[in-house]
């Protein structure tokens, strides 16, 4: 690739020289992707007629360049020819000399933007590449996020390469399994291939429906314990799967057998920040889709575990604990209750553990997610004791959520020796532009240095990283993924990161969630809709009574509604939606806007960012005189009300708008689509993958207000003139969700992944210890001082 670029410079020096001059003339020291593409488009427009056709190779190079840094006389390019593949080069702006740069040299050049990165300056560099097993690495970017398939191949190949050792490892792995004091799979250590074959022959003489209870004693004498199946037929199937695996290992045989081992009956889910409860919390600061995701996830996982344990003949009650923070001053929520059963589940509880000061006092108030870092190590110790007391043993799987939950999951996994699964939901480094380079500017409010360090530790410690989309891992041809953004970066003056994460690591697995079908279903299923909510929805949308939690009364009720629901923070961009609506007389003439989010009275908010957004919303409504066309409600809606609200908007042939500047996944997008409501959602993040643009919904650029308003208006006009068009998009949205985004599919997939990776963890125990030690050192020497520097408010 470097030589091809060098040839381009030789073949067309005039174009390259002119383009570099064009960049220099803008008097900037750096360009990110969007700015660079705009600069290239401007350059093309300025070229003489007929000349632009010859700059195709240059434009292709620029189209795959994520960043340019000007360090006179050199232009430094971060070139990304494909997802996950990075090449750093610099080109002399006059001589057009081309040099490939090391990652360290690129990061040094980047530090120059903030006046650091001097030649010869001693800088701490952390590099994780040599601590990762090469055997876990994928090769093709099209396979990123499908680590399970790769791992099955590697494990099967490992067993096949030494059948005797492979058989021994599998049988040893089976002998380790116990639940509630009883052996599973094997009752002694004398089981071998011959005894397995003889037992399969014996089972073949029995009726398939023979219950396990009737053959239990015979099986015990043969060396087998519960876990093979609930009937003689299923036991025989499972044993034949093992025989096939031991005789001729293959990826399919390995997955099929391991997927039947009842190795998981207790799960710990960790989600610390925000207000975690089942009612009266959504829309509060730091509290949104993650809470909904985890509650639905826990219910689905419990159903899957219960079904799997029953099929395998194991009489054990599965249990899930959702660990979060206990907040004594709970503001009318249940966040002050230690243990809260989850509605809709049989044995899932929210376990709340408080933050404690060093002297043991309990912190009584809510704390911003950006300021909880000094509390986490003590919290992890307290949580460990509580979990062991509740479960009676260690959990079989720990699932961390967001930066704080993932770090605590790392600490617990390390101490308990349990498989660790991380779910980021959102990585802040991807949400705030140049937040790594300008980390010092964010220290007072966000403490990003501490958070990014925690993310780096947790993502490298995890056995499994679950994402909702490919975008989250590796982006697309033009935009980098959230995780990919942690590959090479710098916190100037603190440390540099090389190979911080490898998006080709098989630990990455895409498992997309869904929406709870009890609450989010098509508007057309009229007989199932909660008609008793009609007065409440009517008041919510069209009520004329004044209140501190609402502003605006819709004057023309005949117009369709543009609906948006989210937290009131900068990234969710509800104020941006209000502004683009206010600016567009065409859109205002076609539809009313309803925004559900935050508080309407700024005095009711305790979060600085939310207060700023509330003030901005009021300014926009005042400036554009929107009180007759925009309805803003500061309500916390439960799922039943939210689901019916989507359907009522669909009844009126409205749309749902998700205008976030960045959205890791977009549960509200799934909820709205599940209700049959056409969706317009940000192209930055998960919705780009969820929605087929123009087919099952529409992508919007939240930074381009005019284009977004026009696209909304175009659809509304087209749907008014041809009602079938609205129905086509609605039906396609319903079909898209049914095909790809359900909790049943999610739970099956995640449990399969957890079992395979649990076996991999057993096989590679020694190989993982080197990385673990490196991460321990990094945590003690780098993260801990940063965490202790955050004030304990």
Curated annotation (Swiss-Prot):
Gene3D superfamilies: 1.20.120.1230, 3.10.450.330, Glycogen Phosphorylase B. Residues 263-742 are annotated as: GT-B glycosyltransferase. One of its GO terms (molecular function) is sucrose synthase activity. Keywords: Glycosyltransferase, Transferase. The keyword Manganese does not apply. Optimum temperature is 60 degrees Celsius. Remains stable after 15 minutes at 60 degrees Celsius. The keyword Transferase applies. Pfam families: Glycos_transf_1 (PF00534), GT-B_Sucrose_synth (PF00862), SUS_EPBD (PF24862), SUS_N (PF24861). Optimum pH is 5.5. It catalyses: an NDP-alpha-D-glucose + D-fructose = a ribonucleoside 5'-diphosphate + sucrose + H(+); ADP-alpha-D-glucose + D-fructose = sucrose + ADP + H(+). It is an enzyme of class 2 (transferase). Its EC number is 2.4.1.13. Could be used to synthesize NDP-sugars for large-scale glycosylation processes; its comparatively high thermostability would be useful. GO terms for biological process: sucrose metabolic process. Catalyzes the reversible conversion of sucrose and a nucleotide disphosphate (NDP) into fructose and NDP-glucose; although the reaction is freely reversible in vitro, the physiological reaction seems to be sucrose cleavage. Unlike characterized plant enzymes prefers ADP as a cosubstrate, whereas plants prefer UDP. The KM for sucrose is 45-fold lower in the presence of ADP than UDP. Its preference for ADP over UDP suggests it may directly link sucrose and glycogen metabolism. Homotetramer. Belongs to the glycosyltransferase 1 family. This is Sucrose synthase.
């Amino acid at each position: 690739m470097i030589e091809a670029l060098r040839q381009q410079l030789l073949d067309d020096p005039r174009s390259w020289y002119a383009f570099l001059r064009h960049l220099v003339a803008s008097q900037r020291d750096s360009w990110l992707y969007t700015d660079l593409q705009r600069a290239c488009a401007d350059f093309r427009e300025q070229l003489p007629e007929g000349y632009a056709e010859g700059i195709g190779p240059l434009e292709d190079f620029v189209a795959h360049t994520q960043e340019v840094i000007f360090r006179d006389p050199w232009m430094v390019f971060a070139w990304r020819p494909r997802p996950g593949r990075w090449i750093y080069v610099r080109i002399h702006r006059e001589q057009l000399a081309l040099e490939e740069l090391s990652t360290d040299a690129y990061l040094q050049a980047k530090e120059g933007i903030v006046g650091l990165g001097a030649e010869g300056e001693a800088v701490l560099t952390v590099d994780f590449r040599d601590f990762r097993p090469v055997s876990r690495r994928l090769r093709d970017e099209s396979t990123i996020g499908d680590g399970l398939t790769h791992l099955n191949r590697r494990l099967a190949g490992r067993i096949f390469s030494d059948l005797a050792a492979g058989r021994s490892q599998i049988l040893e792995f089976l002998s380790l399994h116990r639940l509630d004091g009883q052996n599973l799979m094997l009752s002694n250590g004398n089981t071998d291939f011959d005894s397995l074959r003889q037992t399969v022959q014996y089972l073949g003489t029995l009726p398939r429906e023979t219950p396990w209870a009737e053959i239990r004693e015979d099986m015990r004498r043969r060396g087998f314990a519960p876990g093979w199946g609930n009937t003689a037929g299923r036991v025989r199937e499972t044993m034949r799967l093992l025989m096939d695996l031991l005789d001729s290992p293959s990826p399919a045989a390995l997955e099929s057998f391991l997927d039947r081992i009842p190795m998981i009956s207790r799960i710990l889910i960790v989600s610390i920040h925000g207000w975690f409860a089942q009612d009266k919390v959504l829309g509060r600061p730091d509290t949104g889709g993650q809470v909904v995701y985890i509650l639905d996830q826990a219910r689905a996982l419990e159903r899957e575990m219960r079904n799997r344990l029953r099929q395998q003949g194991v009489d054990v009650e599965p249990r899930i604990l959702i660990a979060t923070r206990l907040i004594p001053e709970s503001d009318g929520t249940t966040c002050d209750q230690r243990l809260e059963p989850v509605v809709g589940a049989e044995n899932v509880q929210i376990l709340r553990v408080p933050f404690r000061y060093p002297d043991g006092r309990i912190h009584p108030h809510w704390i911003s997610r950006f300021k909880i870092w000094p509390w986490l190590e003590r919290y992890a110790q307290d949580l460990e004791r509580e979990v062991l007391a509740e479960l009676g043993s260690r959990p079989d799987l720990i699932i961390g959520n967001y930066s704080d939950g993932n770090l605590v999951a790392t600490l617990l996994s390390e101490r308990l020796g349990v498989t660790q699964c991380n779910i980021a939901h959102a990585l802040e480094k991807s949400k705030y532009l140049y937040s790594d380079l300008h980390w010092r500017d964010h220290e007072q409010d966000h403490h990003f240095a501490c958070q990014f360090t925690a993310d780096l530790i947790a993502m490298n410690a995890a056995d499994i990283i679950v994402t909702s989309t490919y975008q989250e891992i590796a982006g697309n041809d033009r935009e980098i993924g959230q995780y990919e953004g942690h590959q090479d970066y710098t916190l100037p003056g603190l440390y540099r990161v090389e190979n911080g994460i490898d998006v080709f690591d098989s630990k990455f697995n895409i498992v997309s969630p869904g929406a709870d079908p009890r609450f989010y279903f098509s508007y057309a299923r009229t007989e199932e809709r909660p008609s008793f909510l009609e007065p409440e929805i009517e008041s919510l949308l069209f009520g004329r009574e004044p209140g501190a939690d609402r502003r605006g009364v819709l004057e023309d009720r005949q117009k369709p509604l543009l609906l948006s629901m989210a937290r009131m923070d900068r990234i969710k961009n509800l104020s941006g939606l209000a502004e683009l609506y206010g600016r567009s007389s065409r859109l205002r003439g076609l539809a009313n806007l309803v925004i559900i989010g935050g508080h309407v009275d700024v005095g009711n908010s305790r979060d600085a960012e939310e207060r700023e957004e509330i003030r901005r919303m009021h300014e926009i409504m005042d400036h554009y005189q929107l009180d007759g066309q925009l309805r803003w409600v500061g309500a916390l809606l439960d799922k039943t009300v939210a689901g019916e609200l989507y359907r009522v908007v669909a009844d009126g042939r409205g749309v749902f708008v998700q205008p976030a500047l960045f959205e890791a996944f977009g549960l509200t997008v799934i909820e709205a689509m599940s209700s049959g409501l056409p969706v317009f959602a940000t192209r930055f993040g998960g919705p780009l993958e969820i929605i087929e643009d123009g087919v099952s919904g529409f992508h919007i650029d939240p930074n381009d207000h005019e284009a977004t308003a026009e696209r909304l208006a175009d659809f509304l006009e087209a749907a008014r003139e041809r009602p079938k068009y609205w129905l086509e998009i609605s039906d396609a949205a319903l079909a898209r969700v049914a095909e790809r985004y359900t909790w049943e599919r999610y739970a099956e997939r995640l449990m399969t992944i957890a079992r395979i990776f649990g076996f991999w963890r057993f096989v590679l125990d020694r190989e993982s210890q080197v990385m673990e030690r490196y991460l321990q050192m990094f945590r003690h020497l780098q993260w801990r001082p940063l965490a202790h520097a955050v004030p304990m408010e």
